[in-house]
Amino acid sequence: MTQTLSQLENSGAFIERHIGPDAAQQQEMLNAVGAQSLNALTGQIVPKDIQLATPPQVGAPATEYAALAELKAIASRNKRFTSYIGMGYTAVQLPPVILRNMLENPGWYTAYTPYQPEVSQGRLEALLNFQQVTLDLTGLDMASASLLDEATAAAEAMAMAKRVSKLKNANRFFVASDVHPQTLDVVRTRAETFGFEVIVDDAQKVLDHQDVFGVLLQQVGTTGEIHDYTALISELKSRKIVVSVAADIMALVLLTAPGKQGADIVFGSAQRFGVPMGYGGPHAAFFAAKDEYKRSMPGRIIGVSKDAAGNTALRMAMQTREQHIRREKANSNICTSQVLLANIASLYAVYHGPVGLKRIANRIHRLTDILAAGLQQKGLKLRHAHYFDTLCVEVADKAGVLARAEAAEINLRSDILNAVGITLDETTTRENVMQLFSVLLGDNHGLDIDTLDKDVAHDSRSIQPAMLRDDEILTHPVFNRYHSETEMMRYMHSLERKDLALNQAMIPLGSCTMKLNAAAEMIPITWPEFAELHPFCPPEQAEGYQQMIAQLADWLVKLTGYDAVCMQPNSGAQGEYAGLLAIRHYHESRNEGHRDICLIPASAHGTNPASAHMAGMQVVVVACDKNGNIDLADLRAKAEQAGDNLSCIMVTYPSTHGVYEETIREVCEVVHQFGGQVYLDGANMNAQVGITSPGFIGADVSHLNLHKTFCIPHGGGGPGMGPIGVKAHLAPFVPGHSVVQIEGMLTRQGAVSAAPFGSASILPISWMYIRMMGAEGLKKASQVAILNANYIASRLQDAFPVLYTGRDGRVAHECILDIRPLKEETGISELDIAKRLIDYGFHAPTMSFPVAGTLMVEPTESESKVELDRFIDAMLAIRSEIDQVKAGVWPLEDNPLVNAPHIQSELVAEWAHPYSREVAVFPAGVADKYWPTVKRLDDVYGDRNLFCSCVPISEYQ
């Protein structure tokens, strides 16, 4: 039969690239699970009353090439002016060796958060290096492995200050008046829900205020002034006030460490260590504190520990502080942070080393001195005598200066009264400085760079002597060894080799959706049209971004059944927080601000109660029945008990138990009956897209994990994006922004992230995914995700019972394998199975969530039947090994499971185990063998002997 031109053009080609099983494999799996077709399987599993009659109208699919061309045309609408706006964002030079070998390398960007340290030693080492950079530059004792951005780090510092404060009756937080405005915006938002009063004043007036538990200072103020706060900090400490300091990471290379001046907490953005501005993100924040406060710190902390053989190994330390364990009592709701961006900054420091960083910082400062000297020679006045890279220049004809700047395609900071701000960076050249002279002085200024350089080289007073750093930084060998590109390339490859990512095997983590991050989706994030825009540039320079974001928001509205989408939250946890704030402010607008009870099912993800606590709500847990579903009787009882104080329920759908609950609409109706709102967590949206939607189900607000459902990679623990979809009545209450107003959704609400559109530069990934899949492909992706999960469940059911199933014994897009009976019978635990899977070449499923003693498996639609069978075969082989233990062939204390994982050095060591070396290391054969570099971690040792900085290089050898 002759094909039509449309068939030959094959606009849906990407659908077959994204979905792992081909048509024949899908049919084999359908036969195995007893279903005739994908539609028939979906009809059996998803409750009839919530199935969409037609898929959301997001358009037909496009080929990779057509979608890239379309997006390139949109991106070209952005105008790439040279931005000197500053305010915490500068242009950078990302070393090509890091761009090619890390940012564009799936071995780095497709990995998951390093909960399984044995398969994560490479990125853990890079994160430990990031912590060492933070410690050296801040002068403090403990550092985290990144927070979401500088503004949220400030909010976390405020919350931490209250936790550690000895002034228990104090309830006021003081913010110096020259912090960045976006920082103040986010701090005010967080303070409102915590019930703190924020005082904003000149830093020197802080002592005039009473009942202050914490203070936020900025070492280099938002308009450029360097502050020596040594004496002030000393006085504040004498009054037991916790002092936080925001710092510029590049300025810290030259300036004295705030920790040496007495600061308790120091934080800032690591963006200018090689991470493009990207219209606001993603960027990693650094965060450090005194040792005595370590158990009150937010976010991930990487620590040095030992493995079972006594070898040095790295792990995430002190996890009992975090939301997945402590829930509403956690220090923070942080789940996804900014690992990929922290690692870029880490490797930037490794590549340049202390000498290179000092050269870069000194060059920036020298050019700033030259600019300052020339302007002063011509009679212009600088508002500050002490500066690093930012000048606040008073101008009589401000409108004329800004007009000349625009004509020269230059952005200056324009929001300062009777002055302009100019921030230089590592990309600034002599030619740029001469151009700035022309903009500020006119073309006939007559200034010469070399002459000015001689003048300032021997007489620079722009940094106070007391503020000059007098100690060495980055003395560890890792920062002094890899400065040639060859050495750097090999070092990065050595780290990558230690880790297990999607470029080697499926990562079947339940509730994580580790699907394909296609190359075509990733390509646009490095386009300069997207990468080089300042988040506070004039909106007419970002028309491409605005068009792309508007299209993506429109598609998400259609896919979710909501009326509006806010793109600001830069992680799923931030999305939860933003959605709950919208609910809170909605109730307040109706004079029902007393509604503060949040109902949360016992099965919920730990971020849910942590976010509810952050939003100022009381958490009341709703029981689940024996089938894992929300207990409707208990829900109704708790809702009645809450009465007029009921704010909302947070529910995940399909449930975290891997089931489409039949009563989800009734759950929504009960909560609405008592005046509450329904927050539907979007963590499992990959089982909804095209089949049903939160808005159609009856929810009022959801966050969407774009780094799950919509293909943004996990990056080893970030970046993420968590935009929220809302019904119309909540739209006026989504986050706003004090610097940039969000067109189409102007609100007076405070911000939750530093940038108005969060991590805007990764939104093209989700745009590309939806554009290439179209309505047809998106629905099919959800259906195949469901098929893959049911195929695994059906094949493993006899060996590992599936804990919860829905109608007809089916699961949704993930399934929970119950290991508890086996553990009781044999002594082998879910942990042993997880570690043994490493020997078979797999990352473990999610352990002990949402039920202790279980493994939760989510294969996604991207894995082929071949890979699913390989995983199933590994699990069945492990079950046979457990049977060997049960039969007494291998003792419980010495078998391949309890000793897993096995490493290369064991092959040549003395062997005293009752099983062979081959059984130990080659259980799945020798082809494509993944070798972990450490044995099972000793978690107890790591937390009892907490060490969170770089160890001697010999320990890695």
From Swiss-Prot:
Its EC number is 1.4.4.2. One of its GO terms (biological process) is glycine decarboxylation via glycine cleavage system. CDD domains: GDC-P. The modification N6-(pyridoxal phosphate)lysine is found at residue 708. Its cofactor is pyridoxal 5'-phosphate. InterPro entries: GcvP, GDC-P_C, GDC-P_N, GDC_P, PyrdxlP-dep_Trfase, PyrdxlP-dep_Trfase_major, PyrdxlP-dep_Trfase_small. It catalyses: N(6)-[(R)-lipoyl]-L-lysyl-[glycine-cleavage complex H protein] + glycine + H(+) = N(6)-[(R)-S(8)-aminomethyldihydrolipoyl]-L-lysyl-[glycine-cleavage complex H protein] + CO2. Pfam families: GcvP2_C (PF21478), GDC-P (PF02347). GO terms for cellular component: cytosol; glycine cleavage complex. Keywords: Oxidoreductase, Pyridoxal phosphate. GO terms for molecular function: glycine binding; glycine dehydrogenase (decarboxylating) activity; pyridoxal phosphate binding. The glycine cleavage system is composed of four proteins: P, T, L and H. The glycine cleavage system catalyzes the degradation of glycine. The P protein binds the alpha-amino group of glycine through its pyridoxal phosphate cofactor; CO(2) is released and the remaining methylamine moiety is then transferred to the lipoamide cofactor of the H protein. Belongs to the GcvP family. This is Glycine dehydrogenase (decarboxylating). It comes from Escherichia coli O7:K1 (strain IAI39 / ExPEC).
